[in-house]
Every structure is written in structure tokens, then in C-alpha cells.
Amino acid sequence: MAKQQEAELIFIPFPIPGHILATIELAKRLISHQPSRIHTITILHWSLPFLPQSDTIAFLKSLIETESRIRLITLPDVQNPPPMELFVKASESYILEYVKKMVPLVRNALSTLLSSRDESDSVHVAGLVLDFFCVPLIDVGNEFNLPSYIFLTCSASFLGMMKYLLERNRETKPELNRSSDEETISVPGFVNSVPVKVLPPGLFTTESYEAWVEMAERFPEAKGILVNSFESLERNAFDYFDRRPDNYPPVYPIGPILCSNDRPNLDLSERDRILKWLDDQPESSVVFLCFGSLKSLAASQIKEIAQALELVGIRFLWSIRTDPKEYASPNEILPDGFMNRVMGLGLVCGWAPQVEILAHKAIGGFVSHCGWNSILESLRFGVPIATWPMYAEQQLNAFTIVKELGLALEMRLDYVSEYGEIVKADEIAGAVRSLMDGEDVPRRKLKEIAEAGKEAVMDGGSSFVAVKRFIDGL
């Protein structure tokens, strides 16, 4: 039998930490899975004008410095980017327009890569692996006769929503209406009807809705879709896509992919301070509050959380992302005397090493914004979640893990930070009490899912097999 040609894959991730980290971890997994088949993974990195490019590049390089088979190519900046007013009004539309302007830059990069090869080369470029925001670049792959795959850093349930948008648009319906509290829809892969109000906020404005639909329309053009989830977690959704409805592309459940390092310029002294404090706490006694790496809470909301933590009197670790417009450090915005009153009971920090924290025996609950990476990390260690979604698809994630999967405690399902509502201290305190002391927390089920997640990526597990199927199909 002739030796199979080695493959190179070109990854184009979305340039924010959660997406970049998941992409790097996927690249490592593919190479380690079949090192004789996956020779190289090239990452084409790009940035948005308002993101700190130098920090991100340094971060990327640190993640791959020991990975000789992963290489990084930084694309030039886009000339004449869309106006920032569009981002403020409809961020999804801005991102899609920006990616379209990247087409000539990606074309040049691919042309250079491919022109350096000849027919006798033992390594061939097998395809593009695109973040779902980058689906306009499928056109560039087609120009070079390269198949495109989509890497979905979100859930299989999110993929069901994208399939729903595709079907809905065939009926030429306008953007959705959030004001109808009673309205529910049937989403592929869901057992329960889905309330409209838990869909991404962008679906309720014309410009962003059109961008979402445009992305959904490109998904069927992919040769396959890689999803950071696993069969035991989202069985109904994966069963739906296994049936290949409307000749939809093959879907590969390749998760859970966990990201161990989520911060450029890692502050080791802060990490050590946090972990040392946790070491001194009793088992399962600490509630961890963390709301992601992209957005900061309003100063008034910070004060309500602080009041809630005083009310419940439970040990806590609270990560506060600062907002330069309102406060440069947590101490500036916390209520007067708060730190003295909770001394010995709680710890407030800026950045926190989330995976290490969730893995720590002292953690007994997690109040989370419900980013998909955070959900997978919490499930991996069997830590109960109280849901407080903020933006993007987090409301749908919250609905999925509370109502569809029965794996989390509902604090809020449809909260959207940009609408300006302040959640009051009493409500937060009640959720924290229920999370840490309540009988409704599905601890046995969480333990089973944690074990299933471990088994999925082991030799012979469902995600292990899915990765093999993907590589064999290159």
C-alpha cells in the first residue's frame, strides 16, 4: 500500500483569546493524534483595529513556542476597514465586512504558501479550517481548490440555531422580535421549544440579523464542521446532525477542548496568590465569580455583587475585569470598607487562572457568564454553575445547560448586559445560596458528565474517533 501523503492545514481563527486558545489546542490535538499524517498546521493571524495586536501576537507565539509543527503567519492590516460606527451599531455586521476585506490578504498568503510547493513535495495543503466568523474566506479556498472546514468554538446547540436561521431565511422573514416574551421557536437539535429572548441579541436588529443569516448560509458550503463539544453532553443535537439533514456537512464532535492559559502576559505572582489562598479553604466551600475576558461590568453592578456577597457570608473568589473608562482597579469601585468586612472570607482579583481554579478542590460553585469555554471547563471538573449570561450566544448557552441538559442552576437566562439592567443584590445572593447549599444542584449528573468528557477524548472515545474520521477524510 502506498504511503499516505502528509497534510498541512491552514487555520484562520477569530482573534480573541477564547477562539485563539481553542484553535491552538485543536491544532495540538490533531498533530498528536496522527503525527505521521498531520505534518504542519499554519495559523494565519489577523487582528481588528481596536484589539492590541502586539500583546496578542506575543501571546500566540508563547503558546506555540514548543510546537515545531505549528507555525504562525501574521497578515497585514486591512486597509480602509469598516467604520467603527458600524461596530457600535451591529458588531456582527462589522466583523463580517472586515473579514471580506481580508480576502486579498488571505489570497496572497495562500498563493505564497502554495507556490513554494512542487508536485514531488511529500506534504500537501489539505484545506482551510475557518472560525465561523471567517466563512467569507471559503471563497478564497475555492479559488485554490482547497476544501474549507469550519471550527465551531461554540456548542452543537449553537449549530442548531444556525441551521434554524438558514431555514427561517428561506421564508424571507425579517429580524426576530425580542419584545414578545411568550414566543418560542423550534430549533433543530433541541428537545424543548426555545424562547426567542435567549437568542443572540444581534438577531433583533436588522444589520446584525442579516450578518448572522449570511454566515448561516455559508455553513453548508463547508466540507465539514468541527464542534467543541462531545456526544454525551449534547446527544440530541449531534443525533440530529448525524442524519445529515438537507445534505448538511458532516459534523465532528471533537471536544471538550480545554484552554489552560487564557491570558497574554501571564501574571505568575497573582496566580500563586490566588492558588495559595484556595489551598487554605475547606473543600467545596468557595463560590467563584468570573464573567469572561472581553467585557467589564458596570460600576453599579459591581456594588450589587459586593452587597450580595456580604449578605450570604459564603467564602468567595471574585475576578473583576477592570474598565479603564470607569475604574482602573477593583479597589476603586468596591463599596467603602468592603475588603475589611470580608477579610478572611473572600478574595478579589483582576485576572484569574480559570481552569486551575475550577480544578481546585476548594471550589464548590461557579457564577458564570456562560461563555462556552467556561461551561466546558466547569463541566470538566464537575463544578455547578449559576447562569448569568451577558452577550453574544451566552443566553442560548445558559438555556441549553439549564433547560435542555439539566446541568446548571438558573439565575438568569435572558440577561443582556448592553440593555443596562442592574441585577439586584437580593437576587444574586439567593442564587449564590442555592448554588452552594441548594438541593436542586445536579451534582451526581455533573460528576457523570465530567467522567464522560474525560472518556470522550481518550483512545476509542467518541471525540477521539471523530478526530480520526476528520483526519482520514483529508
UniProtKB/Swiss-Prot annotation:
Give UniProt keywords alphabetically.
Answer: Glycosyltransferase, Transferase
Q: Does the keyword Transport apply?
A: no
Q: Entry's InterPro entries?
A: UDP-glycosyltransf_plant, UDP_glucos_trans, UDP_glycos_trans_CS
Q: Belongs to which family? A: Belongs to the UDP-glycosyltransferase family.
What is this enzyme's EC? Answer: 2.4.1.-
Signal peptide residues are none
Q: What does this protein do?
A: Possesses low quercetin 3-O-glucosyltransferase, 7-O-glucosyltransferase and 3'-O-glucosyltransferase activities in vitro. Glucosylates other secondary metabolites in vitro like vanillin, trans-resveratrol, curumin and etoposide.
Which Gene3D superfamilies does the record cross-reference, listed alphabetically?
Glycogen Phosphorylase B
Q: One GO molecular-function annotation for this sequence?
A: quercetin 3'-O-glucosyltransferase activity
Spell out the protein name for this chain.
UDP-glycosyltransferase 71C2
Q: What class of enzyme is it?
A: transferase
Highest taxon above the source species: Eukaryota
Q: Which Pfam families match?
A: UDPGT
Binding of UDP-alpha-D-glucose occurs at 293, 352-354, 369-377, 391-394
Glycosyltransferase as a keyword of this entry, yes or no, is: yes
